[in-house]
């Protein structure tokens, strides 16, 4: 089993590029699995990240870097992006880095608002979608199920995310503080129909806002509101919707920000949750208009305590080690099976001698049962030790012992070298390249 992943997120690129990469990734996992290029694949696509997890087949024609390059190039072509740009933009992980990264992500430690819980459900839905489409290999299922357990443990054992914070919830809290009236009386206009827009709709309703309109530059507002409620806004009706809105929320990451000149006069709060910006920053200079950006959200969000973050990272590191240890232990199955076959073959040969000399009698049956119990007992300790040594990275010692004592030839399982936890820059410190092409 060789697992890897490709990642593009808000930490390294703008939201518009993430969106284009996500579009380019549509169908890539299914295609790679159907062609036999991958044994399994799961795509995690959210409003601010694209992650493609893959498993190489047992006898792959390319190594991990080669497979990653092929996938990145295919995504680039489908997205209409420069291949070299995509290769340089997407982070690549393999071996023990994969569970460590996924467990960190699912716990909210990689999120723009540390500790947010939306990502946990998104990871769960990514697995369900892959299982439904038939691209989720057993090893990838084990990885994502372990990620879900890790997220639950982080939530139960630390204070991380206990307030149920998210980018959307923090932004709406800020908007509530600076907008006149209460949510039941406010009129909201949402730009976008993606995951962020869906989360925004749910958060607005939780706060009692019922008068919600939705605009989509791609024309998907009608379909979105049919499924989630609200009223669709067309290009023709957009000026009227802007005039009616008390709160305007952008989460589409459109190709070009709306200029300030399109905003009608009057007091309103504008919330821009798109990393690529839905609205020109000059909106903040308009009379009686308050602009809330992602940077505003990061500054305003109550910081998680160092203790909570440290405790969460400890859980993630332990879970990643446990996953790798269990994986390595399972890789010793071939050696265990070889030892059992050898031992049982010796037993069967001796039992044949007993039958030849004494025939099939009640005594012979009792002897066979006793000998098989004895063999199972003798094999117990070597079986346990095989998994222990594998978990300690000493599988080669066990294999050498089998060869020396029994003449059994078994391939040594691949044991990835331990890698140090990756250190990530704060999103605000990381340059975000923009797509070309």
Curated annotation (Swiss-Prot):
Task: Please provide, alphabetically and separated by semicolons, the GO molecular function terms listed in this UniProt record.
Answer: glutamyl-tRNA reductase activity; NADP binding
E.C. no: 1.2.1.70
What SUPFAM superfamilies does the entry give?
A: Glutamyl tRNA-reductase catalytic, N-terminal domain (SSF69742), Glutamyl tRNA-reductase dimerization domain (SSF69075), NAD(P)-binding Rossmann-fold domains (SSF51735)
**Sections of the chain in a coiled coil:** none
Q: Please list the reactions this protein catalyses.
A: (S)-4-amino-5-oxopentanoate + tRNA(Glu) + NADP(+) = L-glutamyl-tRNA(Glu) + NADPH + H(+)
* Ligand binding (NADP(+)): 192-197
Q: Does the keyword Mitochondrion apply?
A: no
Any Pfam family: Shikimate_DH
Entry domain remark: Possesses an unusual extended V-shaped dimeric structure with each monomer consisting of three distinct domains arranged along a curved 'spinal' alpha-helix. The N-terminal catalytic domain specifically recognizes the glutamate moiety of the substrate. The second domain is the NADPH-binding domain, and the third C-terminal domain is responsible for dimerization.
NCBIfam families of this UniProt entry?
A: PRK00045.3-4 (NF000750)
Per its UniProt record, what PANTHER family does this chain match?
Answer: GLUTAMYL-TRNA REDUCTASE (PTHR43013:SF1)
Q: What does this protein do?
A: Catalyzes the NADPH-dependent reduction of glutamyl-tRNA(Glu) to glutamate 1-semialdehyde (GSA).
- Other known facts: During catalysis, the active site Cys acts as a nucleophile attacking the alpha-carbonyl group of tRNA-bound glutamate with the formation of a thioester intermediate between enzyme and glutamate, and the concomitant release of tRNA(Glu). The thioester intermediate is finally reduced by direct hydride transfer from NADPH, to form the product GSA.
Q: What is this protein called?
A: Glutamyl-tRNA reductase
What is the species of this protein?
A: Kocuria rhizophila (strain ATCC 9341 / DSM 348 / NBRC 103217 / DC2201)
What is this protein's gene name? hemA
